[in-house]
């Protein structure tokens, strides 16, 4: 008989009646290790994490989350939550736990007039960007489009727009939260303000966040960005240049220095280091023009090995 871990370190027998009772409360599927979709649902971005929850609820909506949390509370079960599953430490999955997989909850609604987006907690960054960019709007998210919004936001979050508008958590206006007793509440600066304060950067241990309201800004839909690469032998001078430019750059310009092989591109060798530039106003030409008038160190920006 299958068993699930309890919070006191014990085990609970998952009898057919117990599983059937939970299934009757759900709209989404309840997966156990015998189900064909179980393996894919427990997998995370970090493939080194290989943990096996006792069962997985693939939530289709808030009601599924509420029912699952109440079930876990009633039986004192270990509970874990998967949003985008991108956390490097694999916090979304635990051995023997009841795992809530929110990856089917990926709706995004944009209020263009109020410049607010509501996104379900299973969204990845690309889901939000695709919908907001229809209106020439964006919020502060991260760097990788396959990252989940939930972990990013609850951990603070920073990305290409952070120099201009702060952390992701600075731009959250409200959150839908299923509390540990299975109730749904709304947390804002005015409603459940202490919960709102804790969630904005404090992680997800105060409840299961099922949706976020984000402040939007006029950005795009056309932006300028790319990768500039230099030989690895120039790394000290390039990093000095990066530090200098980062101090002087306008808030619309984001620079990220990466000591890594450059991506495949004409003129890029394996011994080439890459630096990523991203901006949403036409500043790169002016910076490169200024760089040509400065020292050898600054001329590195004007004459990289390759750009892509």
Question: What are the functions of these language-model segments?
Answer:
Residues 1-70, 86-107, 260-268:
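N-terminal flexible segment immediately upstream of the FAD-binding catalytic core
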Residues 37, 83-89, 142-150:
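Short, solvent-exposed turn/loop segments enriched in Gly/Ser/Thr/Pro and often Arg
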Residues 138, 175, 180-308:
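C-terminal cap/substrate-recognition region of VAO/PCMH-type FAD-linked oxidoreductases
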Residues 21, 29, 118, 281-284:
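Mature extracytoplasmic enzyme cores
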Residues 47-79, 102-145, 149-150, 155-191, ...:
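N-terminal glycine-rich flavin-associated loop
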Residues 27-28, 74-78, 96-97, 135-138, ...:
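Loop/turn elements at helix/coil->beta-strand transitions in domains of secreted/extracellular proteins
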Residues 91-94, 151-154, 221, 269-271:
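Short acidic, glycine/serine/threonine-rich loops at helix termini
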């Amino acid at each position: 008989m299958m068993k699930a871990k309890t919070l006191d370190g014990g085990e609970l027998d998952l009898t057919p009646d117990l599983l059937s009772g939970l299934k009757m409360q759900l709209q989404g599927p309840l997966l156990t290790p015998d189900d064909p979709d179980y393996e894919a649902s427990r997998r995370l971005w970090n493939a080194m994490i290989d943990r096996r929850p006792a069962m997985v609820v693939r939530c289709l909506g808030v009601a599924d989350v509420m029912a699952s949390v109440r079930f876990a509370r009633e039986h004192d079960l270990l509970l874990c939550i998967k949003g985008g599953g991108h956390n490097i430490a694999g916090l979304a999955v635990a051995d023997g736990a009841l795992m809530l997989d929110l990856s089917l909850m990926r709706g995004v609604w944009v209020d263009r007039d109020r410049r607010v987006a509501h996104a379900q907690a299973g969204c990845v960054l690309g889901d939000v960007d695709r919908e907001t960019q229809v209106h020439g709007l964006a919020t502060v998210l991260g760097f990788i489009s396959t990252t989940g919004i939930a972990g990013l936001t609850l951990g603070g979050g920073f990305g290409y727009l952070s120099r201009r508008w702060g952390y992701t958590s600075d731009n959250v206006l409200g959150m839908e939260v299923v509390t540990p007793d299975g109730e749904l509440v709304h947390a804002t600066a005015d409603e459940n303000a202490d919960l709102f304060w804790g969630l904005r950067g404090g992680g997800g241990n105060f409840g299961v966040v099922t949706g976020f309201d984000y402040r939007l800004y006029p950005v795009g839909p056309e932006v300028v960005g790319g990768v500039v690469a230099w030989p690895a032998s120039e790394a000290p001078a390039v990093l000095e240049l990066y530090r200098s430019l980062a101090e002087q750059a306008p808030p619309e310009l984001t620079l990220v220095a990466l000591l890594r092989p450059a991506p495949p591109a004409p003129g890029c060798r394996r011994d080439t280091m890459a630096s990523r530039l991203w901006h949403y106003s036409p500043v790169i030409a002016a910076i490169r023009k200024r760089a040509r008038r400065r020292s050898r160190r600054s001329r590195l920006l004007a004459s990289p090995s390759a750009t892509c």
